[in-house]
């Protein structure tokens, strides 16, 4: 068994869609980044890559490459799954936490879980997504950005 942790942060920007966990959420601002800036999927991807000792998303999907400009992060997560499969790993579970002040996303969490589970070939009960605010503290509290943390457990396939 191996564990991995992933953390990602993106600032908010005008004129961008807000996509978290593969779900487009109505918002005046979206997250800024080279890809679609899906902070949740980036943290999950980093956790999985770390658990398998395969580096991080910056190594596999550099923000200097036009190939990944505005790419759907679900495509990146699918590629991460293929890398783990190739190395002989099976994903046991994922636990993730979103940190953002606004918008409120509780009504979207189950859809995020379903998207991640479907993408990774997991049962829904193997994917946990939670959200919290930063109690108005720091850049998250000032609604300047959002962050996500993810932990995963993987094992070598029998």
From Swiss-Prot:
GO BP annotations, alphabetical order: isopentenyl diphosphate biosynthetic process, methylerythritol 4-phosphate pathway; terpenoid biosynthetic process
Residues annotated as binding a divalent metal cation: 8, 10, 42
Coiled coil: none
Pathway it works in: Isoprenoid biosynthesis; isopentenyl diphosphate biosynthesis via DXP pathway; isopentenyl diphosphate from 1-deoxy-D-xylulose 5-phosphate: step 4/6
InterPro entries: MECDP_synthase, MECDP_synthase_CS, MECDP_synthase_sf
Cofactor note: Binds 1 divalent metal cation per subunit.
Catalysed reaction, written as an equation: 4-CDP-2-C-methyl-D-erythritol 2-phosphate = 2-C-methyl-D-erythritol 2,4-cyclic diphosphate + CMP
SUPFAM superfamilies per UniProt: IpsF-like
GO terms for MF: 2-C-methyl-D-erythritol 2,4-cyclodiphosphate synthase activity; metal ion binding
Pfam hit, one: YgbB
Cofactor or coenzyme needed: a divalent metal cation
Record site feature (Transition state stabilizer), residues: 34, 133
Keywords annotated in UniProt: Isoprene biosynthesis, Lyase, Metal-binding
EC number(s) reported in the record: 4.6.1.12
Residues binding 4-CDP-2-C-methyl-D-erythritol 2-phosphate: 8-10, 34-35, 56-58, 132-135, 142
EC class (word): lyase
Entry's family note: Belongs to the IspF family.
Subunit structure of this chain's protein: Homotrimer.
The protein, known as: 2-C-methyl-D-erythritol 2,4-cyclodiphosphate synthase
Organism, scientific name: Chlorobium phaeobacteroides (strain DSM 266 / SMG 266 / 2430)
């Amino acid at each position: 068994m191996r564990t991995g942790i992933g953390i990602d942060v993106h600032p908010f920007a005008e004129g961008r869609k807000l996509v978290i966990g593969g779900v487009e959420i109505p918002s005046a601002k979206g997250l800024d980044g080279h890809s679609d800036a899906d902070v949740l999927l980036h943290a999950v991807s980093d956790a999985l890559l770390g658990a398998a000792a395969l580096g991080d998303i910056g190594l596999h999907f550099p923000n200097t490459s036009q190939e990944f400009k505005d790419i759907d992060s679900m495509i990146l997560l699918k590629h991460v799954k293929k890398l783990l499969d190739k190395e002989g790993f099976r994903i046991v579970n994922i636990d993730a936490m979103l940190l953002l002040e606004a918008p409120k996303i509780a009504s979207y969490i189950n859809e995020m879980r379903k998207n991640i589970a479907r993408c990774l070939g997991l049962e829904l009960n193997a994917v946990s997504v939670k959200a919290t605010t930063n109690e108005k503290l720091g850049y998250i509290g000032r609604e300047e950005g959002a962050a996500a943390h993810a932990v995963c457990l993987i094992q070598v396939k029998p």
